[in-house]
Amino acid sequence: ELSLNPGMNIQDGMLTTHSERTYYAPEADFLREFLGAPWDMIDSPTPAQNELFGPKRRRVPEMMDLKHPVLLGPVQNQEHHMNGVVSRRDNFNEPILGFLEDAYKEFGELTGRHYGLVSTYKTEDADTVYVTLGCAAENIEEAVDYLRDNEGAKVGSMHVNVIRPFPEAAVINALRGKKNIIVLERTDEGLSGDNPLARDIRCALSKGVEAHRHKGTLPPIKPEERPLIFRGSYGIGSRDFRPEHVLGAYEYTQGKTHRKDGKGADDGETFFVLGVNHPYAVISKATPSLLPEKAIAVRFHSIGGWGMITTGKNLGSIIGEFGDVISKKDPSYDAFGALEDKLFVSANPKYGSEKKGAPTNYYLVVAPKPIRVNCELNHVDVVLCCDPKAFTHTNPLEGLNPGGCLVWESSDSPETAWQRIPQKHRQFVKDNNIRIFILPGFQIARNATSRQDLQLRMQGNSFLGAFFRVSSFLDDNSINEDQFRDVVEKQYQKKFGRFGEAVVSSNMEVMTQGFNLTQEITYGEVEDADTSSMRQSPLAPLGDHEIAPTAGCAESGCSSCEPPEEQPERAPVQTLAKFDSEFRNGLGYHQPAGALSAMGVMASGTGATQSKYVARRETPVYIAENCTQCMECITACPDTALPNTSQDVETILSTAARNYINNPEERVTLLQAIPEIEKQSREQMVESVQAKSDKPFSDIVSELVSGLENISDETKKEFSGIIAQLPLAYSNVTAIFRAVEKKSPGNGGLFSIFVSDLCKGCGECVQVCGDHDALRMTVETEELNAQLTTAQIF
């Protein structure tokens, strides 16, 4: 407002925008007084403004004024344009840093919070100084303490608070005489000589040397006082920035480690990257958490749309309320007479652009000291896993500290739950004394509400209760059960009170049940059965077949169709194999930063092999006898997850006999009987349509096959079994069977709608089907999944 220049307050995406911290908020009235109102009359702070507005002006000049109209932003020709551009420098740009310094000073005098153009941390005796923007500085400050305490390193940190105008004098004074500086930036401009911050710092230091040699307006710096500049890229697109990255950067400057390509500081290479699998990457072998002593670190695993992030925020708020209780129980005061905090919280979510239906995480730390680390937590004490299928796509046990706790969504028995843990992880559980708890969160939520959307969201509240059951938080802070319930209920009143007492009560009940029903399981054997896939094996055909990738069989052979021979060979970048080798090869967060990632190209068909099984709680089941083939469900499905087909009766019967009968001799016998089975089946189908009895096709076939001679009961069972797994409609699909059969007897067919593994269980198809009742949402089970997969494979 003083400079009359546009201003931007830049934040780190997903961290400073989404993180939750314990902090003191300045009073609203104080901020209003400090900032002033737009209509306040102030002294014009510069000669230029005095020339334009007079000795006094509005704090925010009113240029859109009908009483005093002016033309804003006219087109400028060449004889005028440059005048305006260069005159902004001395009239409006150059005074800005002075205004900022005055504002920092005034704010510090009023609040005790002192900032400046740059903020330094332990740089006085430092030989090496990190230079950063944004929340990375707090991570680095914790690492600075670690390096000083454990290695005796003379290292410090500088945070640049103002990037435009660039505070060259402040930077020169802060970095003069250092041996090394490590400039870390959330960008990588490969076509530029340096990334922006490093470029500005290099320019400022060069000007300082020039001032030493030739005089100038900036503070002088001797050539021997100019530090060596190391430059690193990190955190782009919210990429995780971890302690081992900070330590690796320092080790690189000291020649203790090299880049992945083998080059190091002794080779004159001063550029590196952090946090990705790249030839220029550096990383330390040391992986400390850098969390305060006695901290409790929590990691949530869930699915986007299930309310886990809301649960995490509620947990953070509740712990914050406990902090007030603890501080008042044994009060102490700071130099200003304010009650000192004795409990600190830091929390942040992690999710991608797809969020809903995709895996999500939430991280929370509670500690008796301020928490400066804001990365993903790889050292945790409690894992709250709201996702019952977590082991099918991740490892929720990863990073659990010895003696840590995993609370896992499961309505299974303890013995079955142990078998849900992959065998490869069970020894880790035993070796590290990991405590495994199960909690039927969805069942608790279903008992609390009949609304499915609320069941998903309220499930998380049960895990909130489970946290207080399994963690040491209540005992560590001497909080009894009455205090616990009182604080939680007050938070629920604050969060849900506007929806009515019933909502508060139901959420409180879910939380309480989560606390009470959390059950610890005893270890089984490492060699016990492994049912961690959460799937049953489908009924597979004999021999080798090309299987639709959307079938969800999760077995070898599920590949996309081969291109025709006459089609030219694809370049690697166009193939699914190349894409899968980097992005779906079990590498998780450690995919290579290579040529393919640089292009930003995906081969066609990647979605066909993507499973939504992880997120599905309910699946539509096709009721063939009710289907009218209106196709509303097909067009409504947002995921093209309802493939459909019409087939001849003979094709269905022959395919079943040819591919699902194990006895070769009886297979031949059955194939010979197919024409007669088809004939009799068709007769009964016509009778059923005329009688409107809607007799299932599978029942018709089963009765006919049971009467065959020279075929064993086992073969009859195999044949009837596969037919029973198929969604085959004829009764009400007029265009496929009834009309065709009437016009051309013997030619009516069967219609099928399959549910593929692309289905996320949104229920849109059931909604549009309506009263036809040909699709019904059904709880997803391993048995149902196997049946749907069997049908698709067929």
Summary of predicted features, one role per range:
Residues A25-A28, Y362-V366, I793:
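Short, hinge-like loop/turn segments at secondary-structure boundaries
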Residues S3-E185, G190-K285, F300-I303, M308, ...:
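Flexible, low-complexity linker and terminal segments
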Residues G500-I753, L758-C759, V766-F794:
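Ferredoxin-type iron-sulfur electron-transfer modules and their immediate structural context
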Residues L175, E398-N401, C769:
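A generic alpha-to-beta junction signature in SAM-dependent methyltransferases
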Residues P165-A169, N180, L184-R186, L290-T575, ...:
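Active-site cofactor/cluster-binding pocket
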Residues D43, P47-D102, S472-N477, V487-R498, ...:
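N-terminal leader/propeptide and maturation segments of large enzyme subunits in energy/redox metabolism
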Residues S157-N161, F166, A170, I182-F241, ...:
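Glycine-rich, acidic loop regions that bind phosphate or pyrophosphate groups
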